[in-house]
Curated annotation (Swiss-Prot):
Subunit structure: Interacts with DSC2. Interacts with JUP. Interacts with KRT5/CK5, KRT8/CK8, KRT14/CK14, KRT18/CK18 and VIM. Interacts (via N-terminus) with MARK3/C-TAK1. Interacts with DSP. Interacts with DSG1, DSG2 and DSG3. Interacts (via N-terminus) with CTNNB1. Interacts with CDH1. Interacts with the RNA polymerase III (Pol III) complex proteins POLR3A/RPC155, POLR3F/RPC39 and POLR3C/RPC82. Interacts with CTNNA3. Interacts (via N-terminus) with SCN5A/Nav1.5. Interacts with ANK3/ANKG and GJA1/CX43. (Microbial infection) Interacts (via N-terminus) with influenza A virus RNA polymerase subunit PB1 (via C-terminus); the interaction competitively inhibits the interaction between the subunits PB1 and PB2.
Comp. bias regions, Low complexity: 286-297
Organismal lineage: Eukaryota, Metazoa, Chordata, Craniata, Vertebrata
UniProt modified residues of type Phosphothreonine: T177
Name of the molecule in the record: Plakophilin-2
GO biological process: bundle of His cell-Purkinje myocyte adhesion involved in cell communication; cardiac muscle cell action potential involved in contraction; cell communication by electrical coupling involved in cardiac conduction; cell-cell adhesion; cell-cell signaling; desmosome assembly; desmosome organization; heart development
Annotated PANTHER family: PLAKOPHILIN-2, PLAKOPHILLIN-RELATED
Compartment list: Nucleus; Cell junction, Desmosome; Cell junction; Cytoplasm
Effect on the protein upon substituting K654Q: In ARVD9; impairs protein stability
UniProt GO cellular component terms: adherens junction; cell junction; cell tip; cell-cell junction; cornified envelope; cytoplasm; desmosome; intercalated disc
Impact reported for R635W: In ARVD9; uncertain significance; loss of GJA1 organization at intercalated disks resulting in a punctate pattern of localization synonymous with gap junction proteins
Effect on the protein of changing C796R: In ARVD9; impairs protein stability
Matching Gene3D superfamilies: Leucine-rich Repeat Variant (1.25.10.10)
Residue positions, PTM Omega-N-methylarginine: R46
Length: 881
């Protein structure tokens, strides 16, 4: 099976594999010399057998050298370089690296004997010193054959490292030369092929045990310019870097917190702590700590010594003091000897809350130790209300707040994470933070730190999980509705409690009703000046302005905090309206998202909810300088002979007509601050969001803001109503909201129509656009749920407004078949009085007032007693609408 070689290789026999398999190869095997060459050697005075013997020795040396450099471990299967790559691709040789499972090809660049060899691949680039005196033929010139070898099972003397897709690189320590076996051990890379992998660990007894891992992401730590992934088994060389180094600006523990923060089955609203899960050998010289981004470990190496961890179900393992100090904070130590015995105490003692709180002493502990203790507290308070209470009893909150002054990013980040879990759903801890002057301390850190992770710890949860985990919008909390006397508007105020996946430290504090006014007093100005105004781009006109110190998540988190604060009450609303730049920035940001065709932006939802709350009772709470201008004509209205007009006094129809005849105050072309709240630009902005956004809470807040602005009968509500209906054609958008699936949006839309229908000049237009829709949403029977009762009552009052002064509108209501529904609901008032039944009774009484329709009623088989009876008369005369 010999094949003639190329001229440069004349005299050598080609491989015994046939051409049908290998084709035209460009390299030769290390076969024996040809007979012709042996004859030539014999004629030159050298014995052929001697040449043959030397050639065999040379062949064996080169084969062993190439085998040592090129083999790659894959479990128990090793691949040598005796078979060309494409032979594997022909599936003639079965191997784990064939086909789609093959990793990125590695390139080898070997210089002369004793020089450094570099290797690179998907996992990074590394160097090693080789003592081989033979150079490797470059792959571009030769394709050496490959052989398959089956190696024995893994043993404690030979550890395999499993790596994630993150970069892997390793450098030998100064003065160390990696020979063949050491370099092979350092280069054993197993590419992750499954989400679940079994990692071979070494127990104290020398036996192997397996640990199941449910996450392919592994933590990565920085050391100089080299990025090493964390080892999943004991390192082959204990002298190599194992521990974190202090002073690193950011740890992968915090970066990967973003990847694993929101996982299925977790209690919402908390920070996933950064806690090491690792087996630990009793040999301190070889003890290592490696961190994993997942806490889903089903089994630890019990033989390896005590450790502590908590998986997703809350089950405890053990964490030693030494482990917490080595890796709990996520910031690495270059030397284990950094800790003295007096500092560590017994490193194998189990870490407890008591011990962790006692370690929070800035004057006596290294920053890395403090970070480890704070991280442990953060971890223990995750899903454990008892741990939160215990830390409070140990005065741990005070110690954590005092540590905020430490000028160390890692300490500040760990402390903020611990505080964030401590205040989650624990009002006592929230009040404790406030009483200990914690809010100003947090704001000081927020202003001074340049670390984005710390800012996010203070304002909200981790960053990027929103897209990965379907980040839900902030849930609006509808407070008990308050009715403004004589205004006909039922206004709800939006707020956000401790929400799933939205639970920053300040956000959680602002969810406590007792702390909202405190937050407004201490945090409003700082958050507005340092976050809201810079990011929104106002007043420069840019949108938005993310930079190295701010990003969208921080802006979103702060708007969520302000959203809670805006529901504090009258004093809080007034303070927020007076805050320079707040309303301007919010309006500027929302207008920018609409212009960029992003009406579903989740920060826009928060901004609109804030504006919605600030428009609540606006007419009554306006500063005197605005009310004097708006109501100047209102006070000049006089009635003839000072007599009260109508049975309802100042709320009668004739007085409303006089209000509507009063000229409206001129609108400022350049509004500022609170003036934006009723400006036509903002009204148009709300209508755009109603029409374009698909987020229910954005729609509800926009409708609610217009509802608040149109509540009442003064110049401002009348002007806003006319703008909505006549100038901006807003009825078409409001009408569509009557048919959405969300009942809260539907209820708010009907409440807005009810306010609009109080304007006499708009009633016919409203009836023309919406009367059939109003009838369609009225149920056939008495509603049972509170929300449906409110919706039905508002629909009946709206119909009552538009039929009172119009015979034609009343006839249209009769023709649509709505009277039968109304009578059925009114009848329910006899046995279960509610708002809907009362509103239906009022509407029936008003319908009978149109005498010209009596014949039509009788023709439709209705009697007078269906419209006028003791029930309907009582409801009508008790009406204070």
């Amino acid at each position: 099976m010999a094949a003639p070689g190329a001229p440069a290789e004349y005299g050598y026999i080609r491989t015994v594999l046939g051409q049908q398999i290998l084709g035209q190869l460009d390299s030769s095997s290390l076969a024996l010399p040809s007979e012709a060459k042996l004859k030539l050697a014999g004629s030159s005075g050298r014995g052929g057998q001697t040449v043959k013997s030397l050639r065999i020795q040379e062949q064996v040396q080169q084969t062993l050298a190439r085998k040592g450099r090129s083999s790659v471990g894959n479990g128990n299967l090793h691949r040598t370089s005796s078979v060309p790559e494409y032979v594997y691709n022909l599936h003639l040789v079965e191997n784990d690296f064939v086909g789609g499972r093959s990793p990125v090809p590695k390139t080898y660049d070997m210089l002369k004997a004793g020089t450094t060899a570099t290797y690179e691949g998907r996992w990074g680039r590394g160097t090693a010193q080789y003592s081989s005196q033979k150079s490797v033929e470059e792959r571009s010139l030769r394709h050496p054959l490959r052989r398959l070898e089956i190696s024995p099972d893994s043993s404690p003397e030979r550890a395999h490292y499993t790596h994630s897709d993150y970069q892997y690189s390793q450098r030998s320590q100064a003065g160390h030369t990696l020979h063949h076996q050491e370099s092979r051990r350092a280069a054993l890379l197993v590419p992750p092929r499954y989400a679940r992998s079994e990692i071979v660990g070494v127990s104290r007894a020398g036996t192997t045990s397996r640990q199941r891992h449910f996450d392919t992401y592994h933590r990565q730590y920085q050391h100089g310019s080299v990025s090493d992934t964390v080892f999943d088994s004991i390192p082959a060389n204990p002298a190599l870097l194992t521990y974190p180094r202090p002073g690193t600006s950011r740890s992968m523990g915090n970066l990967l917190e973003k990847e694993n923060y929101l996982t299925a089955g977790l209690t919402v609203g908390q920070v996933r702590p950064l806690v090491p899960l690792q087996p630990v050998t009793q040999n301190r010289a070889s003890r290592s700590s490696w961190h994993q981004s997942s806490f889903h470990s089903t089994r630890t190496l019990r033989e390896a010594g005590p450790s502590v961890a908590v998986d997703s179900s809350g089950r405890r393992a053990h964490l030693t003091v030494g482990q917490a100090a080595a890796g709990g904070s996520g910031n690495l130590l270059t030397e284990r000897s950094t800790f003295t015995d007096s500092q560590l105490g017994n490193a194998d003692m189990e870490m407890t809350l008591e011990r962790a709180v006692s370690m929070l002493e800035a004057d006596h502990m290294l920053p890395s130790r403090i970070s480890a203790a704070a991280t442990f507290i953060q971890h223990e308070c995750f899903q454990k209300s008892e741990a939160r209470k215990r830390v409070n009893q140990l005065r741990g909150i005070l110690k954590l707040l005092q540590l905020l002054k430490v000028q160390n990013e890692d300490v500040q980040r760990a402390v903020c994470g611990a505080l964030r879990n401590l205040v989650f759903e624990d009002n006592d801890n929230k009040l404790e933070v406030a009483e200990l002057n914690g809010v100003p301390r947090l704001l000081q850190v927020l202003k001074q730190t340049r670390d984005l992770e710390t800012k996010k710890q203070i304002t909200d949860h981790t960053v990027n999980l929103r897209s990965r985990n379907g980040w839900p919008g902030a849930v609006a909390h509808a407070c008990n509705p308050s009715t403004l006397g004589g205004q006909g508007g039922r206004i709800t105020r939006s707020g956000v409690r401790d929400q799933p996946d939205q639970h920053g430290l300040l956000w959680n504090l602002s969810s406590n009703d007792k702390l909202k006014n405190l937050m407004i007093t201490e945090a409003l100005l700082t958050l507005t000046e340092n976050i809201i105004i810079p990011f929104s781009g106002w007043p420069e006109g840019d949108y938005p302005k993310a930079n190295g110190l701010l990003d969208f998540d921080i802006f979103y988190n702060v708007t969520g905090c302000l959203r809670n604060m805006s529901s504090a009450g009258a004093d809080g609303r007034k303070a927020m309206r007076r805050c320079d730049g707040l309303i301007d920035s919010l309006v500027h940001y929302v207008r920018g998202t609409i212009a960029d065709y992003q009406p579903d932006d989740k920060a826009t939802e928060n901004c609109v909810c804030i504006l919605h709350n600030l428009s609540y009772q606006l007419e009554a709470e306006l500063p005197e300088k605005y009310s004097q201008n708006i109501y100047i004509q209102n006070r000049n209205i006089q009635t003839d002979n000072n007599k009260s007009i109508g049975c309802f006094g100042s709320r009668s129809r004739k007085v409303k007509e006089q209000y509507q005849d009063v000229p409206m105050p001129e609108e400022k072309s350049n509004p500022k601050g609170v003036e934006w709240l009723w400006h036509s630009i903002v009204i148009r902005m709300y209508l755009s969001l109603i029409a374009k956004s698909v987020r229910n809470y954005t729609q509800e807040a926009s409708l609610g803001a217009l509802q608040n602005l149109t509540a009442g009968s003064g110049p401002m509500p009348t002007s806003v109503a006319q703008t909505v209906v006549q100038k901006e054609s807003g009825l078409q958008h409001t009408r569509k909201m009557l048919h959405v699936g969300d009942p809260s949006v539907k209820k708010t839309a009907i409440s807005l129509l009810r306010n609009l229908s109080r304007n006499l000049s708009l009633q016919n237009e409203i009836a023309k656009e919406t009367l059939p829709d109003l009838v369609s949403i009225i149920p056939d029977t008495v509603p049972s749920t509170d929300l449906l009762i409110e919706t039905t009552a508002s629909a009946c009052y709206t119909l009552n407004n538009i039929i009172q002064n119009s015979y034609q509108n009343a006839r249209d209501l009769l023709n649509t078949g709505g009277i039968q529904k109304i009578m059925a609901i009114s009848a329910g008032d006899a046995y279960a009085s509610n708002k809907a039944s009362k509103a239906a009774s009022v509407l029936l009484y008003s319908l009978w007032a149109h005498t010209e329709l009596h014949h039509a009623y009788k023709k439709a088989q209705f009697k007078k007693t269906d419209f006028v009876n003791s029930r309907t008369a009582k409801a009508y005369h008790s009406l204070k609408d």
